[in-house]
């Protein structure tokens, strides 16, 4: 039997598993991933939950409105997280069949982000007006959410062009970072990172950082792939160069497998490695 599928008791306690979604747990696009990798991950979760009461959090930059879609995609593989962290830092905990927000935590994230945006309000609005004029078919994804400048474009080229423009325009800014998911591009306030959310969850669970496992592939994952947030750090083989560098610097594990296969590999590495 494959070692990822074995029922042996894990050698190390892992209290919290924090995984990115796009590019990590799910490949997206036309990339084909074997269902066996998801079955292996489900078995790992079952073993860890049975042995240590381990909790699993999906930590994603996706809008809160995308939560039902993500949960359905996970459910198709028999997976159900204990927490959903949306827009990098907004925390929701599973209660029965529903996910309930961490009201005060989420409000504090909202307030900090609004203050950051307020300091650059005119500049951000001018940039949004320019983007809308140049790309009239772009769909604004911001609305009343925590991030104003968030667009979905109808072509990859347009998204890449706007991403590059924002990177140049806001280079060196400590209040913002630029991120792109396929055809979606956002200018995100730096307040409320994935790393902060993971630390908040660890505190909620009474878990020491040495009992926290995190894995990702993209730039906005770097804050949780940091020894300040987690002691068991990993990235999948398809991770961006900046992410691999961050994991190497943290003396973490770089998987040879891509997407969920890499998650299974990294989790097995740490679960069977004595503390």
Task: Give the role of each language-model region.
Residues 12, 187-188, 195-275:
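Mg2+-dependent phosphoryl-transfer enzymes with acidic/Ser/Thr/Gly-rich catalytic loops
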Residues 29-48, 234-237:
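Basic, amphipathic juxtamembrane/active-site segments
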Residues 10-31, 225:
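Asp-based phosphoryl-transfer active-site loop
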Residues 39-134:
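Active-site phosphate-binding/coordination module
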Residues 17-24, 87-89, 96, 143-146, ...:
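Short loop/turn segments at strand-loop or loop-helix junctions that form parts
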Residues 126-215, 219-227:
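Conserved acidic, metal-coordinating active-site core of Asp-based
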Residues 71-73, 162-167, 242-250:
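Short, aromatic/basic amphipathic alpha-helical patches
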């Amino acid at each position: 039997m494959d070692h990822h599928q074995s029922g042996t008791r894990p050698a190390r306690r892992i209290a919290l598993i924090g995984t990115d979604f796009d590019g990590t747990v799910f490949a997206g696009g036309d990339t084909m991933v074997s269902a066996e990798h998801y079955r292996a991950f489900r078995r790992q979760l079952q073993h860890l939950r049975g042995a240590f009461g381990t909790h699993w959090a999906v930590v994603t930059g996706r809008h809160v409105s995308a939560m039902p879609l993500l949960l359905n995609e996970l459910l198709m593989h028999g997976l159900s997280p204990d927490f959903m962290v949306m827009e990098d830092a907004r925390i929701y905990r599973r209660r029965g069949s529903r996910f309930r927000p961490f009201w005060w935590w989420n409000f504090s994230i909202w307030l900090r982000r609004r203050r950051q945006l307020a300091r650059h309000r005119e500049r951000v609005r001018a940039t949004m007006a320019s983007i809308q004029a140049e790309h009239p078919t772009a769909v604004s994804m911001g609305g009343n959410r925590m991030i104003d400048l968030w667009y979905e474009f109808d072509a990859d080229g347009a998204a890449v062009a706007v991403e590059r423009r924002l990177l140049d325009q806001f280079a060196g800014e400590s209040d913002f970072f630029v991120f792109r998911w396929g055809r979606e591009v956002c200018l995100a306030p730096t307040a409320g990172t994935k790393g902060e959310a993971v630390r908040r969850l660890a505190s909620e669970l009474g878990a020491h950082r040495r009992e926290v496992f995190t894995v990702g592939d993209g730039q906005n994952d770097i804050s949780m792939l940091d020894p300040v947030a987690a002691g068991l750090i990993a990235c999948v083989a398809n991770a961006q160069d900046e992410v691999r560098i961050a994991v190497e610097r943290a003396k973490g594990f770089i998987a040879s497998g891509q997407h969920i296969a890499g998650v299974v590999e990294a989790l097995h590495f740490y679960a069977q490695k004595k503390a």
